[in-house]
Amino acid sequence: MGHSFYSCDWGTSNFRLRLVHLPSLEVTSELRTADGIDRLEGDDPGRFASYLVDRINELPGSEDQASEIPLWVSGMASSSIGWRELDYARLPFPLDGSGAIVAALGALTESRPCPVRLVSGLRSEDDVLRGEETEALGLLKLLGRTEEETLLILPGTHSKHLQAREGEISSLRTFMTGELYAILTQHSILRHTVEEPETLAGLEDAFVEGVRSGARDGLSGGLFAARTRQVLGGKEPRENGAYLSGLLLSAELEPAGNCGSDIFVAAAGVVGDMYRRAATELGIERLETVDERNLELSVPAGHALLEKNFQGEAS
């Protein structure tokens, strides 16, 4: 028999809430805000629950749901700046979700008594993540990659590389690609010469030059060229932005060329284009980008897997 649940992805700077129906995994409504965890200031421990109740009440269709349907929350809500700090689950991490640390927080409020299930993050001996564990569980399930050796790349401010094999995530590694781009273009001398491109159209040569520079000279050795390309070569800021993107992606992707796995990148649009083009230039043949539908369903699918396991059913 089908039932519904709320899927909440609550990051540092963004909030996303969806009403999901099982077993179809149909998202019947959703709501997004820029109210990340770090924006809910104050010492009142009830502020997180109050915020969630307000958002659930705004969610189309929520008034038709039973008041006790589960609410799954992942992301920074389980961090030291969040709702309740939870320890990280450890590698190896089973892809059926059975290794996840889930805290049952009880009813959200008296007026909205949804049972709250807070999901912790994941750690290795020297790296951590929060939120991406749920996304990875969902994506690998949707892609049918729960047994095959797979390198899953989750781009972002901090790009996460998760190695999966034989039904578990065995390693993780973080690349600060997005944050480095932001720092370099906003706070370094390169801010005067670089503009972020919205597309690779007409900029592929500059992007490829950046990828090749990274492979040849290394990241540090290729950075200043983003300035000299304009000062000496008269290149436009968008071209330099494409060059810098290629340089940074070269540094991120080059180690992946030796992993021996099929590689899946959770990105569409210009970001997906950049990963594919950089991989081609670096001779990485077994890289695919994830389609938009699976990207959209990744977190709800991860929560659905955890919900199934939480109820004690076979995964």
Regions found by a protein language model. Give the residues of each.
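Glycine-rich phosphate-binding/hydrolytic loop that grips phosphoryl groups
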Residues: 289-315
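Glycine-rich phosphate-binding loop plus the immediately following alpha-helix
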Residues: 38-40, 121-214
